[in-house]
Regions:
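Primarily a tetratricopeptide repeat
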Residues: 13, 20, 57, 61, ...
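Canonical positions in the second alpha-helix
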Residues: 25-28, 62-65, 99
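TPR/TPR-like alpha-solenoid signature
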Residues: 40, 77-79
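N-terminal alpha-helical interaction modules that lie
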Residues: 1-54, 102-166
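Short coil/turn linking the two alpha-helices of tandem helical-hairpin repeats
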Residues: 50, 70, 85-88, 119-120
Length: 166
């Protein structure tokens, strides 16, 4: 099964299935453990469908259900785009900073369109390469020129420069 289907009908079906499965976990166990990571896929799926409102609703639900969850890089990338699109630039910038703190390579890949040189110490940053490679190309393509220009200003900010130097 592909991570993200291509056809809108299939995307809607995947969204419904994941939402049903998450609700089923909640109903049966009183909590959501979600070992597969469906909670990270719903926002990107809504965005791929062109449903910014649905994506925003998902992220609000996510924040309420998983307040301590740091998210996955592709999840944070899409969350920041949704917030940017609805005019919440400060919150969107916060998500981009969280993305850089979690993975220093996703945002440069978005901005340059090229795979950055991975100069990390795998032992010091376990999972960072895997998470970087785990972001599907379709999610980078969601960003238009205006959003990319805004993301570049966030990337060049003193706060993000400090995060990148760690």
């Amino acid at each position: 099964m592909d991570l993200f289907p291509q056809e809108p009908r299939q995307i809607r079906e995947r969204i419904r299935r994941y939402e049903r499965l998450l609700q089923k976990e909640m109903d049966e166990f009183g909590q959501i453990s979600d070992g597969y990571g469906k909670r990270y896929l719903l926002g990107p799926l809504y965005l791929l469908l062109g449903d910014t409102t649905g994506a925003l609703s998902h992220y609000e639900w996510f924040e309420a259900m998983f307040p301590g969850d740091r998210g996955h890089p592709m999840h944070l990338l899409c969350w920041s785009l949704v917030l940017y699109r609805v005019g919440q630039q400060a919150a969107a910038a916060t998500r981009l900073r969280q993305l850089v703190a979690a993975n220093r390579y996703v945002l440069p890949r978005l901005l340059s369109g090229e795979t950055p040189v991975l100069d990390l110490d795998v032992e010091a940053h376990p999972g960072e390469v895997f998470d970087f490679e785990d972001v599907p190309i379709e999610l980078y393509a969601l960003w238009d020129e205006e959003a990319l220009a805004w993301a570049q200003t966030v990337y060049d900010s003193p706060e993000v420069r400090q995060l990148r130097s760690k």
